[in-house]
Curated annotation (Swiss-Prot):
Catalytic activity: tRNA(Asx) + L-aspartate + ATP = L-aspartyl-tRNA(Asx) + AMP + diphosphate
Residues that coordinate or bind L-aspartate: 194, 240, 468, 509
InterPro entries: Aa-tRNA-synt_II (IPR004364), aa-tRNA-synth_II (IPR006195), aa-tRNA-synth_II/BPL/LPL (IPR045864), Asp-tRNA-ligase_1 (IPR004524), Asp-tRNA-ligase_1_N (IPR047089), Asp/Asn-tRNA-synth_IIb (IPR002312), AspRS_core (IPR047090), GAD-like_sf (IPR004115)
GO cellular component, one term: cytoplasm
Sample GO molecular function, one term: nucleic acid binding
Organism in which the protein naturally occurs: Desulfotalea psychrophila (strain LSv54 / DSM 12343)
Protein name, UniProt field: Aspartate--tRNA(Asp/Asn) ligase
Biological process according to GO: aspartyl-tRNA aminoacylation
Family, as annotated: Belongs to the class-II aminoacyl-tRNA synthetase family. Type 1 subfamily.
Length: 607
């Protein structure tokens, strides 16, 4: 068939809906509806011919219904159905009928019924899609993102967006019921240092000046508390120009909250109620607050990180004191020079091959390990290890006791600075859990991490940096440390971690100007710079700012965990790639020279 003939043929078979009005979605009909006249609309998922009868799986975002074209019911409609192909758009009218007993499909909610069609309207045709839209076919992510509107027709993707809608609805309802006000804050604001790079927007009316897209509504929500709004929330887009990972996007959605006249316990209580409601509405799962708490220091000691996955054990054990007097010179030297020696016990893993161990050594090197010492526990406390000969029998027994090591266990050691050892063993612990299939995606383990340091020293910048942001309140008992040992001061911050992923965090804020000025000074921000960047906030703190605090949740990351997705991109309708590109629209893209000139920008490329 020539292209022109094909186009004319397609044009003749496409029709309008006319007087047809949809009565049901494709997931709705059951045995109780047998005998009803119904009208369904959707896409052709599959077409099958059996003995002259044509079967179509008709799909919409809700589900699938089998529709049947039988020449004995309507020969004209049956003849018309011969032309149907995948992804054509249909409207059908027919009668709900029971499927023959041996033809029922228990995998579908509509699997007990089918529609005997007596009217068919072809609303649109489709070229052959670039990939099958079933669940079984593996499709490259780049191709899916290029044709995202097709990818979103796939049932799993449609379910993700439906679940996201339910989540947002549940959050709004909960916060509205708890006296929160939904208030919008500006998208075009000024650039302020919050850690990551800002996305900058040049001003056309103010030559050489730029807006920044917000990394968070932090300052505006604090100003709303000073304005007396008392309880604020917003489900808001935020932007960060940073290197991307599987759980990061340049633009992301944040559940943002702020409350006045509260302390940490009250904010945590409100938040746990919201999470409890969210999981009930989306997964019909009953959570039981209060959630567990762990301090930052304890989390680092036990799990090597500040976002502990507590679904499994394999905790870090501190062997530094044993190492200070042990025979192994490498461990002893590191321990005596202020480093640390720690280990984890992978129970019943002594069967790991040398190839496995070499692979784990290479993995540990990615996080700064100069090597990876290991021990396989044999009968009677014997060690199988390249380092076994360097330890006395008593030393081996002490280490085995500290690690609760039994025959068949596999021990891994880290010896270096605390920073390196925590990262190496923390990541190795997670890698072992993945290899041993210890991470149950259907288990939801929540823990609050508290008592973070207020700031840490950045050697590259030669100044202190906030762990969270400069507006986090220090503990009252640590105020005097701001001038003498700011890295020793603890903050009134709290993060909520789910299955080893930080899903939200917040703090009590500074509400007194003198304290805010002292924190900025400790961060190396002098009065002139503070007035330039935060003068509006400092002035507001002088005009009756109430005690306040809040937190923010990453909605995308939370939905990734709720849906069990491997990537945050699977829960966002139109995500960017890890290079911050949109394969669908081909953004970012070049713009006309005239547009740049209007913005006082000089192009540096040749046309």
């Amino acid at each position: 068939m020539s292209e022109n003939v094909k186009k004319n043929w397609i044009k003749t078979i496409m029709e309008s809906m006319g007087s047809l009005k949809r009565t049901h979605f494709c997931d709705a009909l059951r045995k109780e509806d047998i005998g009803k006249q119904v009208i369904l609309m959707g896409w052709v998922l599959r077409r099958r011919d059996h003995g002259g009868v044509i079967f179509i799986d008709l799909r919409d975002r809700r589900g699938i219904t089998q529709v049947v074209f039988n020449p004995e019911i309507n020969p004209e409609v049956h003849a018309k159905a011969h032309s149907l192909r995948s992804e054509w758009v249909l409207a059908i009218k027919g009668t709900v009928s029971a499927r023959p007993g041996d033809m029922a499909n228990t995998k579908l909610g509509t699997g007990d019924i089918e529609i005997l069609v007596d009217e068919l309207v072809i609303l649109n045709t489709s070229e052959t899609p670039p990939f099958p839209l079933d669940e079984e076919t593996e499709v490259s992510e780049n191709l899916r993102l290029q044709y995202r509107y097709l990818d979103l027709r796939r049932p799993a993707m449609a379910r993700n967006l439906l679940l996201r809608h339910k989540a947002v609805q549940a959050i709004r309802n909960y916060l509205n019921d708890n006296e929160f006000l939904d208030i919008e804050t500006p998208m075009l604001t000024r650039s302020t240092p919050e850690g990551a790079r800002d996305y900058l927007v040049p001003s056309r009316v103010s030559a050489g000046k730029f807006y920044a897209l917000p990394q968070s509504p932090q300052l505006f929500k604090q100003l709303l508390m000073i304005a007396g709004m008392d309880r604020y929330y917003q489900i808001v887009k935020c932007f960060r120009d940073e290197d991307l990972r599987a759980d990061r996007q340049p633009e992301f959605t944040q559940i943002d909250m702020e409350l006045s006249f509260v302390d940490e316990e009250q904010i945590i209580e409100v938040t746990e109620g919201m999470i409890q409601t969210l999981f009930k509405e989306t997964l019909d799962l009953d959570l039981t607050p209060p959630f567990a708490h762990i301090t930052y220091a304890d989390s680092m000691e036990r799990f090597g990180c500040d976002r502990p996955d507590m679904r499994f054990g394999m905790e870090l054990v501190n062997l530094t004191e044993i190492a200070k007097s042990c025979s192994f010179k490498v461990f002893r030297a590191i321990a005596e020079e202020g480093g640390t020696v720690r280990a984890i016990n992978a129970k019943a893993c002594a069967h790991f091959s040398r190839k496995d161990l070499d692979g784990l050594t290479e993995y540990a090197a990615l996080f700064g390990a100069k090597g990876l010492a290991w021990v396989k526990m044999k009968a009677d406390g014997e060690w199988q290890s390249p380092i076994a000969k360097f330890f006395s029998e008593e030393e081996r027994a002490s280490i085995a006791e500290a690690l609760d090591a039994q025959e068949g266990d596999l021990l891994f050691f880290g010896a270096d600075s605390e920073k390196v050892v925590f990262q190496v063993l923390g990541e190795l612990r997670l890698e072992m859990a993945r290899r041993l299939d210890l991470l149950d995606k259907k288990e939801f383990n929540f823990v609050w991490v508290t008592d973070f340091p207020l700031m840490e020293y950045d050697e590259k910048e030669d100044r202190y940096q906030s762990i969270h942001h400069p507006f986090t309140a220090p503990r009252e008992e640590d105020l005097d440390l701001l001038e003498t040992a700011p890295d020793k001061a603890l903050s009134r911050a709290y993060d909520l971690v789910l299955n080893g992923t930080e899903i939200g965090g917040g703090s009590i804020r500074i509400h007194q100007r003198d304290v805010q000025a002292r924190v900025l000074t400790a961060l190396g921000i002098d009065k002139e710079e503070a007035d330039e960047k935060f003068g509006f906030l400092l002035r507001a703190l002088e005009l009756g700012a109430p005690p306040h605090g809040g937190l923010a949740f990453g909605l995308d990351r939370l939905m990734m965990l709720i849906t069990g997705s491997d990537s945050i991109r699977n829960v966002i309708a139109f995500p960017k790639t890890q290079k911050a590109a949109c394969l669908l629209t081909e953004a970012p893209a070049t713009v006309a020279r005239k547009q740049l000139t209007e913005l006082y920008l000089r192009p540096d490329w040749k046309e």
